[in-house]
Amino acid sequence: MNTPENSYEQFLEPYLPSTTDRCFVTVTYAQSLDARIACAPGERTKLSGADTKRMTHFLRSKHDAILVGIDTVIADNPRLNCRYPTMAEDYNSPLSPQPVFLDTHFRWDFTKDWALLRSSTSKKPLIITESKNSGKIASYIEFGGEVLQVQDIRNWTEIARGLYSLGYTSVMVEGGAKVIDSCLTSGIADSVIITIAPVFLGTNGLAAAPSHAITFSEPRWWRSEGVPDTICAMKCDPISMK
């Protein structure tokens, strides 16, 4: 257990991206004491406090890309930028990672008013998709976006290799539940960083968990006086990508 004098920046150092010869994968999310990430599917639920939210933005500043599933995009309309260190609502750090959407059938309507497109400094998301809709793909590329077509959107080795081929050496996987479950189950994650809020969401809550048991190495816990949340950070042994 860390002392209050130790910052989360120091605590997280061993779990940050540490390789450039492949795409380093970090899975990070906030959950309740009963391992729920939301009160119900599709319902946005605030779990992180101000301090651990700032920690999330610190992590974003350390990654090339930030990845979420299309259901999370539609439900939450996130900005997916980095506001560290100021945390000002109108601040968009030059360290903001590249947004990446997992969108099997390319459902995202980029012509609508999305939060992450409102700033002139915002980065248009990279769409990872199985879709062969050449018209929509061409329109999005003309719009200024980028598309990575994959054979199987559940194949995280293919996703990581694709990201690396585009120059991304690290990706932060933030959600939602299906994406977290799939990524953890694949065994490709290098680090897992979980914020645990002091609340139960109940059996109707949306859980995030892999489909089988996973043992992590070097687990560490961080707490600080006056901060209600706890952070658990762990290392994984990623599958071979060679």
Language-model regions, residue ranges each:
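Enzymes that bind and transform nitrogen-containing heteroaromatic metabolites
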Residues: 1-242
